[in-house]
Structure formats: C-alpha cells, structure tokens
C-alpha cells in the first residue's frame, strides 16, 4: 500500500488536469494569473483527492468524479482568496496572498471567477440525475461556507460561545466542503444511498478533526513546523475549542486573565494562555475530540466493500492527526 503523500500526489495529479482545463480560458491575462496563483502555489489538494477516492471506493471510475473534484478545489481556493482579504492575511501557502500581488479589487474578481468556474466544471459532465444531485451538494456546501465565515466573524465579539456553536461554525466553514467532496464523489461513482451517506459522514468527521487539530497544533507545535509563531491564534483572539473549554472551566481569576490575553497581539503572553489551557484540560480535551472524530470517520468506512480506495481513505483519516502543520 502506498504512503499517504504518494496517494495524495497520485489523485491530486488526476484532479489537476481538470482544474487547469477549467480555468484555462479565463481572460484577461491578469485575471487568469490572479486566479491560478494559489492553485499553482502548492497545497496537498486533499479535497479533490477525497472526491476521486470516494468515487472509486463505491466501485466507480475516479475519472467520473474529476469535474466534481475540480469544482471542490476551485471553491476552496475562492474561499481562501476572500478569507485572506477579510482577515488581512498577507501570506498563503508560503506565497504572497492574491490581494497583496494584484490588489483587493482584482483578488475579489479572482475569487468570483473561480466560484463561477466551479459550477461549470460540474455541469460539463452533462445533465444526468447524478450530475444534478452532485451539483446540489456543491451548491449547498458554498452556502454553508459563507454561513460558517459569518459565524466565525460574529464570535470575535463574543466570549460566551458554546462548544455546540463552535462545532457548528467549523462544520460549516471547514468540514462542509470536505463532506461535499466525499458525498459528491460517491454520487458520481454510482454509490448506493447507504454508501453515499457513509462517505458524507466520513468527510464531515475528518473535516471537524482537521480543524480541531489545526487549532491544537497552534499551541503544541513549534514555529518552524507551523510557519508562524506558536499561539498566533491566541494573540489574534480566534475562537477555538480550547478557548471555549478553558473559558467554561476556568476559575473567575483565570478566566479574566485569559480574556485579557486573547486578541491582545502580545506574543509574550501566549505561553500564559497555554498554561491556562493545560491547567483546565482544554488542550487535552481538544485532542480527544479530534481523535474521536477520526475514529467515527473510519467506522463509517466499514459500510463500503474492502478495496485499496477504502484503505486509502482510512489512511487519510489517520493522516489528519499525524500532520505537524
């Protein structure tokens, strides 16, 4: 059996061809360059690979899901471009963000054109019921991404966010698109209703684990692995599961201290916040929740027939928690 990175490389190369084909006719040249900047900058392309693997795991040809795989990656890229503008982030995938190189107006257009091209990539597969069903899944994921971003922005003004609210936010902002990749891929592969539902659940679970692990790495990893200062989420005041849990469990004194550190921008105080997380088991709790979602994801794969594709999906689920950045 291949290693996870080899699997992702193989399937991402299959998706890349359709992605390039989908955006090749964008004009003028400036818009094309801005649109393809993050696509050519790298990234593991886990989402399109999951779409292709899901099609194969239900007995289909992964090529039948190539349009869906391309659409998912184009939507993901559009969301990154717009997120970087909203968050005023200047670096993405080790490269200057699109809005840094081409300005905000062109970056907005680049995101918009990728969003539009995503739907074109799906409907190029024809107008069969499978295509219509897959298209509906992709459309729904776009709505959820916007809702998730709005929830996340709203959390910046609140300190009473519950775990349930946080999980809803990361489901919509992150996991919904991953679930759409696996569900739409299974649809295009001709999966049964049970197989399609199982793969949607698998995608949702690894999507939630992915985001929680991201938050976890921010406080337990190192600057070299992260490519950014440890605890930068704390310095920026981002709401994470660890923040939610620490605020819920902490003494009044520690709660007030944590609140004063969150969003202060003072990296010197980050270590103190991490100590508060540790004191109340918030870091350990987040890791346990991520582990539980990976376990649930792998359990849902048992609905499928044994195959190399199913094994690859299980390996990717484990990989979500093995990565260091």
UniProtKB/Swiss-Prot annotation:
Cofactor annotation comment: Binds 2 Mg(2+) ions per subunit.
Pfam families cross-referenced by the UniProt entry: polyprenyl_synt
Enzyme class, spelled out: transferase
Positions contributing to an all-trans-polyprenyl diphosphate binding: 92, 173-174, 211, 228, 238
GO terms for biological process, alphabetical: isoprenoid biosynthetic process
EC number(s) on file: 2.5.1.-
Alphabetized CDD domains for the sequence: Trans_IPPS_HT
Binding-site list for Mg(2+) 1: 83, 87
UniProt GO molecular function: metal ion binding; prenyltransferase activity
Record has Disulfide bond as a keyword: no
Alphabetical list of PANTHER family matching this protein: GERANYLGERANYL PYROPHOSPHATE SYNTHASE, SHORT CHAIN ISOPRENYL DIPHOSPHATE SYNTHASE
Quaternary state and interactors: Homodimer.
Family: Belongs to the FPP/GGPP synthase family.
Protein name: Short chain isoprenyl diphosphate synthase
Species for this entry: Methanothermobacter thermautotrophicus (strain ATCC 29096 / DSM 1053 / JCM 10044 / NBRC 100330 / Delta H)
